[in-house]
Amino acid sequence: MPLELTQSRVQKIWVPVDHRPSLPRSCGPKLTNSPTVIVMVGLPARGKTYISKKLTRYLNWIGVPTKVFNVGEYRREAVKQYSSYNFFRPDNEEAMKVRKQCALAALRDVKSYLAKEGGQIAVFDATNTTRERRHMILHFAKENDFKAFFIESVCDDPTVVASNIMEVKISSPDYKDCNSAEAMDDFMKRISCYEASYQPLDPDKCDRDLSLIKVIDVGRRFLVNRVQDHIQSRIVYYLMNIHVQPRTIYLCRHGENEHNLQGRIGGDSGLSSRGKKFASALSKFVEEQNLKDLRVWTSQLKSTIQTAEALRLPYEQWKALNEIDAGVCEELTYEEIRDTYPEEYALREQDKYYYRYPTGESYQDLVQRLEPVIMELERQENVLVICHQAVLRCLLAYFLDKSAEEMPYLKCPLHTVLKLTPVAYGCRVESIYLNVESVCTHRERSEDAKKGPNPLMRRNSVTPLASPEPTKKPRINSFEEHVASTSAALPSCLPPEVPTQLPGQPLLGQACLT
């Protein structure tokens, strides 16, 4: 018998009327979209945390709930005061016990996130340099019905390694009381502690059955093995497009247009007189930046093209950069929408990210449309993107790691250039107003939207919700508490009859780290 269907008023999609409980996450690998553990591999200062954070930002932006579990943060929570590289020596038995506990604590939180908290991907950010360690993580994934995907960052260029240490590691809490030279010397000795036991991934022999990608020399070469599914292929594609070369991305809206003056949304109107002044001011601004080989991108709508024409530079038109399609509400004012389509107006106020205009788009649709633009932006060096308000919000949310809930309310005023400069683990933004007046098109979040997520949304939809949850503080004993409470080494596994666990945490089962 055919299932009864009902249409989601917010997303305008058909869903079955089914009040049965959703499928348990433990069905894992039997499902195409089962949770995945991404396992980072590599020596310190090889960019693992950079890749982890950047990849997590991308996956959350496209709607795949993802979270990083950095074992170093768990270790810093356990060991309140870092002394020296001696903590990482393989013959330091007490420290080894604490490091194992930290890894176990992180894996417990990985399990909780993927099995109970609605997460889809967990990034296990640690060195994981031995085959034995990786085998245990793989066993943990299989036992919990998670897929495992390994990302190894390999770099033998001493200049790149030294640059990574100077840019990121010396500012780490581990070295807050050290000068640069002392921090560099200690960290190089820390790397040496790992090098003796480092076993790289070997897809030709020992690791031929693993799903993995090796990123070699900061993206100069890649080695990919046994990609299992669509999301892993997207991860591979993303990693092959990013680079670490210094560059600047400029984002701005078109100059004020006639519809902006009238308070109308969408359409394809030309620039107002003030919009033309902004185009001239933008041309002068670009000249002052003195950028070599600046690329200029616009949408296919008149206002962005007129703005770009004033620059007297070559520009490329992207259909993907067109403004959000308002469907039946195109070229209406918000007051006209409220009077003509009161229910649609109320639904959009309630959930602006997921709301889809009748015969039009939602912000969620817009993110999917803009993914090729993000990929190409990651490949480029200096770029100026002239676009529209909703489009600019989506792009800015990606670079600033904003959640789906925040995205539709980001302030992107007319006649202002946003200068984005990538830094170690994020992006620095500078807002530059070009001193040309304009109307304000920003609308604050309504009180209804502030009350919480839309109860009509389904958590098991095809595109999962983004996960704005912050990383939990590691729940482990301090180093001092550990030394005082135990003198025996942790067992090399967790059999059911030996319930070794951290206080206040559930057991992982049989899987553990060594």
UniProtKB/Swiss-Prot annotation:
Residue ranges, annotated region (Fructose-2,6-bisphosphatase): 246-514
Annotated residues for binding of ATP: 42-50, 164-169, 345-348, 389-393, 425
Domain of life, per lineage: Eukaryota
Active site: D125, C155, H254, E323
Gene3D superfamilies, alphabetized: P-loop containing nucleotide triphosphate hydrolases, Phosphoglycerate mutase-like
GO molecular function: 6-phosphofructo-2-kinase activity; ATP binding; fructose-2,6-bisphosphate 2-phosphatase activity
Disordered, as annotated region: 444-475
Pfam families linked to this entry: 6PF2K, His_Phos_1
Binding, beta-D-fructose 6-phosphate: R75, R99, T127, R133, K169, R190, Y194
Hydrolase as UniProt keyword: yes
Phosphothreonine carried by residues: T463, T471
Cellular component terms per the entry's GO annotation: cytosol
Residues the entry annotates as binding beta-D-fructose 2,6-bisphosphate: R253, N260, G266, Y334, R348, K352, Y363, Q389, R393
Alphabetic keyword roster: ATP-binding, Hydrolase, Kinase, Multifunctional enzyme, Nucleotide-binding, Phosphoprotein, Transferase
Post-translational modification: Phosphorylation by AMPK stimulates activity.
EC number annotated for this UniProt entry: 2.7.1.105, 3.1.3.46
Any one biological process term the GO annotation gives: fructose 2,6-bisphosphate metabolic process
Known role: Catalyzes both the synthesis and degradation of fructose 2,6-bisphosphate.
Subunit structure: Homodimer. Forms a heterodimer with PFKFB2.
PANTHER family: 6-PHOSPHOFRUCTO-2-KINASE/FRUCTOSE-2,6-BISPHOSPHATASE, 6-PHOSPHOFRUCTO-2-KINASE_FRUCTOSE-2,6-BISPHOSPHATASE 3
Name under which the protein is recorded: 6-phosphofructo-2-kinase/fructose-2,6-bisphosphatase 3
UniProt source species: Pongo abelii
